[in-house]
Swiss-Prot record:
Its biological purpose: Binds to the 23S rRNA.
NCBIfam families for the chain: rplO_bact
Cellular component terms (Gene Ontology): cytosolic large ribosomal subunit
Compositionally biased spans, kind Gly residues: 21-37
Pfam families, per database record: Ribosomal_L27A
Protein name: Large ribosomal subunit protein uL15
Region (Disordered): 1-52
PANTHER family recorded: 50S RIBOSOMAL PROTEIN L15, LARGE RIBOSOMAL SUBUNIT PROTEIN UL15M
Length: 164
């Protein structure tokens, strides 16, 4: 048995059926589309949610919520993931260990799992449960300021301009 001798199971690769090629084929004349009507025509399909001219459900329901474009997104690390690390654990160490990618607005430690070794954790946010677990293991937590976003820089510049 080798890869070059493998074959697809019988019936797996079917030839494309050619429709509209005479009545003897079983798919002649209307080509499996039934009689007349919108669905029998080319370019027939109306858009998803169309209800025949009646106001569609997605337009009958009220709008709600919004997406905050200035929202800060933090990468999440669980306390249990810190167990293999030692010494000072900061975003650079977490990135080196492959626990975060480093492409968000900071790192937050969540309280899932157990920590057996004492570590100094320097991150942007820590939940109460995570802080308790780290301190129970004999470690310490230091909060570092989150990186300043482009929006915050622009806001500060506008504020400084208004004072002048």
């Amino acid at each position: 048995m080798s890869l070059s001798k493998l074959k697809a199971p019988k019936g797996a690769n079917r030839e494309r059926t050619r429709v509209g090629r005479g009545q003897g084929s079983g798919l002649g004349k209307t080509a499996g589309r039934g009689g007349k009507g919108q669905k029998a025509r080319s370019g027939n399909m109306h858009f998803e949610g169309f209800e025949g001219g009646q106001m569609p459900l997605q337009r009958r329901l009220p709008k709600f919520g919004f997406k905050n474009v200035f929202r800060r997104e933090f990468e999440e690390v669980k306390v249990g993931d810190l167990d293999g690390l030692s010494g000072v654990v900061d975003p650079a160490a977490l990135k080196g260990a492959g626990l975060v990618r480093g492409n968000r607005d900071g790192v937050v430690v969540l309280g899932g799992g157990e920590l057996k070794s004492a570590v100094t954790v320097k991150v942007h946010r820590v939940t109460a449960g995570a802080r308790a677990a780290i301190e129970k293991a004999g470690g310490t937590v230091e909060l570092i300021p989150a990186p300043v976003t482009m929006y915050e820089k622009a806001k500060a510049a506008r504020k400084a301009q208004a004072k002048k």
